[in-house]
């Protein structure tokens, strides 16, 4: 598998566009100014246009404007921090409608941050963000502003729930104060959407909002959560020794970035032979991690990284840390106050659906106002990314249009979520949006132009050959 990783790295060097985007490691914009600790949560500390054009699937997209904001937030323990969030304005945007899209960054490395990875010229290691951009494009095409926060924060705390949720909410606070330059109204409707790792951030934001950001209740209209991560232990168990084993070191490293005692225990318990392997968890974005760590075993097998196997998870510090970041284990104080839509594949072998069933039961028993759960019987984690997206978009559009939500709880099992009611327009919008982004057409409602433009064609070909 290491050979495949080297081969793909070589291929990426051949096809990648010239790297023009400054890394967050050396970009001063990512550094909070002196005295920022005294700023209010959600306050904008810095502002700039994105240094490079944005791209989807590594093709430039034609939008009206985009900005990066450095926003005051806090970590899991209430310590001051600052996160970057990206605001995207399509042509003919509606300033009263905003989608907060949380990407599946799934990495413990700041060079995997969405604000960096969504820019044209970012390295191919950020492919996960580029794939996620393809799901933002349909919403841009329909005139929604899209905001996407670096919710893992400056420490890259993958799987850390409170950090992710707080950052998402503070990003929303910030964009509602950005009218002077973005045009977004302070009373704009805001919905959240995220798949897989993005659902972890979105779910925690929904759970934290009533107490952490109660003033946002008047703006937030719902959250769509796909491949809903509520139990990170279950994902570790499901992926250990599989193609997606890279999620394990990335997740452990993300937790270690936030919890020093947790990190200390990890490196005490890992075998000497696997120490460097574990350290690599801070080096790879999720695409590279899948290749580098494929089929590695951390808790099972004769050569497992942790000789004590799953016994590691019973260590007091480890158990406490993980439990604090499993949304499934939270009590009713974390009950969302906004409408929730969950779509999940029954065959998901990465994020087992059984844990979503537990969360659904808990939230319903505790009296959640609106929870719609659409279970896809024939799809797993990867395929549901695409199959479930039209259902999510349909549900989100209904929220923005003010249509009634499900009262209480409703769970429906479908052969496929392609059969979710009224998704035909949403399905076409996805493929039209992808086509528009690849061909360089302007994104936004009411935009009419030939789908193939000279700039778009040049940009498309420029991904593969040198046109200079």
From Swiss-Prot:
Gene Ontology BP term (one): lipid catabolic process
Top-level class of the enzyme under EC nomenclature: hydrolase
Residue ranges that the Swiss-Prot or TrEMBL entry lists as coiled coil: none
Keyword match Secreted: yes
Disulphide connectivity of cysteines: 112-285, 364-409
Residue positions of the active site: 196, 348, 381
Glycosylation sites: 79, 231, 319, 417, 422, 451
Gene Ontology MF terms: lipase activity; triacylglycerol lipase activity
InterPro entries, alphabetized: AB_hydrolase_fold, Lipase_secreted
Primary site of residence: secreted
Induction trigger: Expression is induced when cells are grown on media containing Tween 80, other Tweens or triglycerides as the sole carbon source, but not in Sabouraud Dextrose Broth or yeast/peptone/dextrose media. Expression is up-regulated during the yeast-to-hyphal transition. Expression is inhibited in the presence of carbohydrates. During host infection, expressed in gastric tissues, but not in infected oral tissues. Expression is induced during biofilm formation.
Keywords assigned: Disulfide bond, Glycoprotein, Hydrolase, Lipid degradation, Lipid metabolism, Secreted, Signal, Virulence
UniProt key word Lipid biosynthesis: no
Reactions performed catalytically: a triacylglycerol + H2O = a diacylglycerol + a fatty acid + H(+)
Subcellular location: Secreted
Signal peptide extent: 1-16
GO cellular component, as recorded: extracellular region
EC number(s) per entry: 3.1.1.3
Role summary: Secreted lipase that is able to hydrolyze both the neutral triacylglycerols and the monopalmitate ester Tween 40, allowing the use of hydrolyzed products as carbon sources. Has broad lipolytic activity, which may be important for colonization and subsequent infection, therefore contributing to the persistence and virulence in human tissue.
Family the entry assigns: Belongs to the AB hydrolase superfamily. Lipase family. Class Lip subfamily.
Listed name of the protein: Lipase 1
Source lineage: Eukaryota, Fungi, Dikarya, Ascomycota, Saccharomycotina
């Amino acid at each position: 598998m290491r050979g495949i990783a080297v081969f793909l790295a070589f291929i990426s060097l051949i096809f990648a566009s010239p790297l023009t985007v400054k890394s967050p490691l050396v970009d001063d914009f990512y550094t909070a100014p002196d005295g920022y600790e005294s700023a209010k949560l959600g306050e904008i500390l810095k502002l700039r246009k994105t240094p490079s054009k944005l791209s989807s699937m590594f093709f430039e997209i034609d939008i009206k404007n985009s900005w990066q904001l450095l926003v005051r937030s806090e970590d899991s323990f209430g310590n001051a921090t600052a996160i970057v969030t990206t605001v995207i304005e399509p042509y003919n945007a509606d300033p009263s409608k905003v989608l907060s899209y949380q990407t599946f960054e799934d990495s413990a490395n700041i060079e995997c941050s969405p604000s960096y990875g969504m820019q044209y010229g970012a390295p191919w290691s950020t492919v996960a963000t580029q794939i996620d951009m393809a799901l933002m494009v349909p919403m841009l095409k329909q005139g929604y502003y899209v905001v996407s926060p670096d919710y893992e924060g400056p420490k890259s705390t993958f799987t850390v729930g409170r950090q992710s949720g707080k950052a998402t909410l503070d990003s929303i606070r910030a964009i509602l104060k950005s009218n002077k330059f973005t045009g977004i109204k302070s009373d704009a409707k805001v919905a959240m959407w995220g798949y897989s790792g993005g659902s972890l951030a979105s779910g925690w934001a929904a759970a934290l909002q009533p107490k952490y950001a109660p003033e946002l209740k008047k703006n937030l209209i719902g959250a769509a959560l796909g491949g809903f991560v509520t139990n990170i232990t279950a994902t570790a168990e499901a992926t250990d020794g599989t193609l997606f084993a890279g999620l394990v070191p990335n997740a452990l490293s993300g937790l270690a970035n936030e919890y020093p005692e947790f990190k200390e225990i990890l490196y005490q318990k890992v075998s000497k032979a696997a120490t460097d392997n574990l350290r690599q968890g801070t080096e790879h974005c999720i695409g590279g991690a899948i290749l580098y760590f494929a089929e590695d075993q951390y808790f099972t097998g004769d050569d497992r990284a942790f000789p004590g196997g799953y016994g590691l998870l019973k260590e007091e510090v480890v158990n406490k840390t993980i439990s604090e970041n499993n949304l499934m284990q939270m009590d009713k104080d974390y009950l969302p106050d906004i409408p929730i839509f969950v779509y999940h594949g029954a065959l998901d072998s990465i994020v087992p659906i059984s844990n979503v069933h537990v969360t659904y039961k808990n939230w319903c028993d505790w009296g959640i106002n609106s929870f719609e759960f659409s279970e896809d019987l024939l799809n797993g984690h990867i395929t549901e990314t695409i199959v479930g997206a039209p259902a999510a978009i349909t549900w989100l559009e209904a929220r923005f249009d003010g249509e009634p939500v499900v009262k209480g709880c409703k769970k429906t099992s479908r052969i496929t979520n392609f059969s979710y009611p009224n998704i035909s327009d949403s399905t076409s919008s996805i493929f039209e949006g992808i086509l528009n982004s690849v061909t360089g057409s302007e994104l936004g409602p009411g935009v009419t132009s030939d789908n193939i433009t000279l700039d778009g064609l040049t940009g498309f070909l420029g991904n593969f050959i040198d046109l200079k």
